[in-house]
Amino acid sequence: MDKQVEIITSVYAGRRFIRKFLENITAQTVFDRCELFLLGANSPDEEYESAVIREFQQNHENIRYEILTKDPGLYNCWNLMIQGSESEFITNANIDDRLHRESIERHLSLLQNEASIDVAYCVNYVSESHVDDVEDCPVELDLFPTAEFSLHALSHSNLPHNHPVWRRNLHEKFGYFSSEFVSGSDWEFWLRCAYGGAKMKLINDVLGFYYKNPKGISTDPENMSRNIIEVREIYERYRKIAKDMWRG
């Protein structure tokens, strides 16, 4: 399927979120220029998820759905979807997050108009209470911390965060998401790209909602110790790379 943007989504334990997620994604202003690649990761809710997805496929031929018999982990799912698709641009979409209807269009437009930029990202609302409509969010919602791109800022925070849009050729230059980490491989990949010369740019508008899911891979309190270890390891790895660069 010849589409400009590949939307990659790992589907696991999505009974609560899958229908509203699909309503949100298919309402994107440029959805007709996208392929939504859903990969079922041996989900306990597979039967329900499949029924809902098949329903949406009846009206959207650009929804692709495949199912794995074993969950290989989030980032291996992403890699499989990236390697199994051809779109020039890629974005990830989490089933419990939500996008402003112009989100993908705004990110795509930036990348198409600025050839020197490799990754586009935006400002997001964040809450521990779930929201389905980004365009009608309560004004008291917090903003997820982000900043204009710099190597220094990226070295201290995963700036692209939960739904950036990036050029496929980054994977040709820098490889894929590492299976070394459970929740930090996206940050490690962006650092790998940036230290290799890739450029990123912030869209300084709220174009999404990030759900601080109490059962999420990176937000479940039970995973906090592991997450801290991963963050420290990634930070120290690229701090050393930065020192070597400046020294050289």
Task: For the regions a language model picked out, list residue spans one by one.
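Conserved donor NDP-sugar-binding/catalytic core segment of glycosyltransferases
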Residues: I104-D136
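Acidic donor-binding loop at a coil-to-helix junction in glycosyltransferase catalytic cores
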Residues: V182-F189
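Short, well-formed alpha-helical segments that are part of the catalytic scaffolds
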Residues: G14-A27
